[in-house]
Amino acid sequence: LSRNHTELMLGACGGDISSEGTTATLHPVKRLEAQKIIVPGDISSAAYFMAAGLIVPGSEICIENVGINPTRDGMIRVCQAMGGNIALENIREICGEPVADIIVRHSSLHGTVVEGDIIPTLIDELPIIAVMAAFAEGQTIIRDAAELRVKESDRISVMAENLSVMGVDITPTTDGMIINGGRTPRGARIQSHMDHRIAMSFAVAALASDGETDIIGSDCVNISYPTFYQDLFKLAKSSFI
């Protein structure tokens, strides 16, 4: 699966592009037309707030202007498969990209299986999905995700290490993990291994866990989302989360 953001943007500027599988073909045009480019919100960043809305009791949040490109929307599909109360509103196109406002409400989640073709659409969201699985009733299995081992950290081992110290029943596998959820995790000392997605995932986990959580190397979030903690804490102080 190849993400098609570039093809969509060029098409919005008058480019003539065809694609098949992982091959994109650009056909000649006289000129491209200048456009006002509006970049949608990144669903990989929105995923943490989606998860927070689902696992923190009493939550109801609206995340506006999020890109929901089908090559990136696996997080939405998995949340729904786990019983998450998620709705897409104001669906539209901006510069060729599908965009929506995502409404999330606290839900009683249940386990699911995440595997196969959906993996490329949510590879960066798997750590926060593992956190959601810890709060969900029943078993969640993640497989076909060996790429997690060669990210900024070995995310399979690191998620297993940190969820275990929070009291979660998790077993790492060669290409994923098995999580038996349903018990509220306890606060713990979390090692981020300087991986921004690990730090952000456990900041969300801390919102709904018992006791205090300390994330070592928490400033690693600056690589992708420098204002993450400010935004998360601002939301946590609101009337809905």
Cite the ranges covered by each PLM segment:
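Short, structured segments at the rim of ligand-binding sites
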Residues: 1-241
